[in-house]
Design a protein with these regions (language model features):
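FIC/Doc superfamily catalytic core
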Residues: 6, 10-326
Length: 327
């Protein structure tokens, strides 16, 4: 019974810890009393002090000031790595979700440069997979490597396009990309989207160093390859866009969009860890929404292009479950 009670206390403390971190995410520099008033269920001040002290020791929370003026805020690391219950988040209606509705200007210049995106255990898993990839690669001829990349290109083109609402099956995609055979009952735009993916991936394979360092111009070039003949405006957008399914409103000022992308390039190019480079490219290009359409397509291809540039195994995204989402 004592052991069960101790386990219940630990579980309760963990729940309270998550609530504290989530509260501080949206209410930085809060007093302990303010934090306690928002934590459910109600706990004693002694317990609250102990849990906050644990958060400070773990590097999740910073203490600002002393005595009655003491305030608490999240560390940059906790801003990105604190636990988040996705099921609870998506169970709420859009207007009930707690989100930052405007662009976070501190993210790229303040938070991301100061944090590690992967733990040592996560990096060990990634580099274990990378070691197997390199071993597999060393046993291939140039022709076999190209065929392997062709297969991965088909998988990635299909999945990336499916995420955008494309209805081609994987088999139909293979026929289209290998034999230029369009599928009956499908639109021309769907075929063009898939062929554009192939062109972008072929370009990266032919110029493997192209994305070793990324730039605004190179991001725009990959975007142009992915969206050609689809009626999508080239280069940075000049008008406001909205995103279905969220109250987040991307930047609507061309100069701020340009600055955010350029800052992202500096951040990514300055990182030494390749997996961090690829992940940052994936999330930041998607977050900034610099183009009227094709943002996530561009992010997925550039992320893979970075992996390829450094001799790392690209990702097909095949295991992702398809849901309707904005581009």
């Amino acid at each position: 019974l004592r052991r069960q009670r101790q386990m219940c206390i630990r579980d309760s403390d963990m729940t309270t810890e998550i609530e504290i971190l989530q509260y501080l995410h949206y209410h930085p520099l809060s007093k302990r009393a303010d934090i306690g008033s928002e934590v459910t269920p109600e706990i004693s001040d002694r317990t609250l002090k102990r849990i906050i002290a644990d958060c400070v020791e773990k590097g999740y929370v910073e203490v600002v000031g002393k005595g009655p003026a003491t305030r608490y805020r999240l560390t940059p690391q906790a801003h990105l790595t604190m636990p988040l219950n996705l099921d609870t988040y998506f169970d709420k209606d859009i207007d009930e979700r707690t989100v930052q509705e405007s662009f976070n200007f501190n993210l790229i210049r303040g938070i991301l440069p100061a944090v590690r995106l992967f733990t040592d255990d996560e990096l060990a898993i990634l580099y274990g997979a990378q070691s197997k990839f390199r071993q597999h690669l060393s046993e291939m001829t140039d022709l076999e490597y190209r065929k392997e990349m062709e297969r991965l290109g088909i998988d990635l083109s299909w999945k990336s396009s499916q995420i955008e609402g494309n209805t081609y099956s994987l088999l139909e995609t293979e026929r289209l990309l290998k034999e230029k055979q369009t599928a009956s009952g499908k639109t021309k735009e769907e075929a063009v989207m898939l062929l554009n993916h192939k062109d972008a991936l072929d370009f990266i394979l032919d110029e493997p160093d192209y994305l070793k360092e990324i730039s605004l111009g190179r991001i725009e070039e990959i975007h142009a390859l992915l969206t050609k003949e689809l009626g999508v405006e080239r280069n940075i957008r000049h008008r406001r866009v909205g995103i279905t399914g969220t109250n987040y409103q991307p930047l609507d000022n061309e100069f701020q969009i340009r600055e955010a992308l350029e800052d992202s390039c500096l951040l990514i190019n300055g990182k030494s860890e390749v997996f961090e480079k690829a992940l940052l490219a994936l999330v930041l290009i998607s977050y900034i929404q610099a183009f009227t359409d094709g943002n996530k397509r561009t992010a997925r291809i550039i992320s893979n292009g970075i992996l390829i540039a450094y001799g790392h195994c690209p990702i097909s995204f095949l295991s992702l479950i398809h849901i309707s989402e904005p581009t």
